């Protein structure tokens, strides 16, 4: 008997555009294999699918080379963080404090 396939999706998004691809892959395909099979690099040549962080339905997958996909799952290709989230929060808090200090009662 042939090895059956499962239907999955692979997605990648930038601030200004995104792409969702529907694939049929063999049972036993890992998260990393699905990303590599997707052909997403056709649309985003800068992507390094061999090393990009990956997730399923908004949750990062620690070992995408080992995690086997199930029917209907959506593989998400994550972009690297541009700024450290802690630093961004500090900057936002400092800005808010400066604004508050500037608003003196009349």
From Swiss-Prot:
Record-linked InterPro entries: Mopterin_synth/thiamin_S_b, RnfH, RnfH_sf
Highest rank taxon of the organism: Bacteria
Coiled-coil ranges (or none): none
Family: Belongs to the UPF0125 (RnfH) family.
PANTHER family: UPF0125 PROTEIN RATB
Name of the protein in its database record: Protein RnfH
């Amino acid at each position: 008997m042939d090895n059956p396939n499962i239907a999955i999706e692979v997605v990648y998004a930038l601030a200004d555009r995104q792409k969702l691809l529907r694939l049929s892959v063999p049972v036993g395909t890992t998260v990393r294999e699905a990303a590599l099979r997707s052909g997403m690099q056709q649309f985003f040549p800068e992507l390094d699918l061999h090393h990009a962080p990956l997730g399923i339905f908004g949750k990062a997958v620690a070992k995408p080379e080992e995690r086997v996909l199930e029917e209907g799952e959506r593989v998400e290709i994550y972009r690297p963080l541009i700024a450290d989230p802690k630093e961004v929060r500090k900057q936002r808090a400092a800005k808010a404090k400066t604004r508050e200090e500037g608003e003196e009662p009349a």
